[in-house]
């Protein structure tokens, strides 16, 4: 009887370990999809001010462009 209980406990532990490994693999896969990869870095947005805008720019501000990438914006 004691042998049966030990075998049952071992089988239960093996099943729980396999289930935990599968969950960890899914969590790792989801985390990898959420992180920005090298292919995401090529996507950027650029904004320029039209020449006929209502407010005139000073001479030093003419030709400036805003270049944004994933939360970081730079003036060019």
UniProtKB/Swiss-Prot annotation:
Family indicated by similarity: Belongs to the alpha-defensin family. Theta subfamily.
Entry protein name: Theta defensin subunit D
Subunit structure: BTD-7 is a cyclic heterodimer composed of subunits A and D; disulfide-linked.
Keywords: Antibiotic, Antimicrobial, Defensin, Disulfide bond, Fungicide, Signal
Entry superkingdom: Eukaryota
Signal peptide: 1-22
Cross-referenced InterPro entries: Alpha-defensin, Alpha-defensin_N
GO biological process assignments: antibacterial humoral response; antimicrobial humoral immune response mediated by antimicrobial peptide; cellular response to lipopolysaccharide; defense response to fungus; defense response to Gram-negative bacterium; defense response to Gram-positive bacterium; disruption of plasma membrane integrity in another organism; innate immune response in mucosa
Biased composition annotated in UniProt, kind: Low complexity: 30-44
Disulphide-bridged cysteine pairs: 68-73
Cross-link Cyclopeptide (Arg-Cys) (interchain with C-73 in subunit A): where in chain: 65
Post-translational modification (record): Forms a cyclic peptide with subunit A (BTD-7). An additional intersubunit disulfide bond is formed.
GO cellular component, one term: extracellular matrix
The protein's role, per its UniProt record: BTD-7 has antimicrobial activity against the Gram-negative bacterium E.coli ML35, the Gram-positive bacterium S.aureus 502a, and the fungus C.albicans 16820.
Proregion span(s): 23-64, 74-76
Organism: Papio anubis
Residues covered by region (Disordered): 25-47
Crosslink feature (Cyclopeptide (Cys-Arg) (interchain with R-65 in subunit A)) location: 73
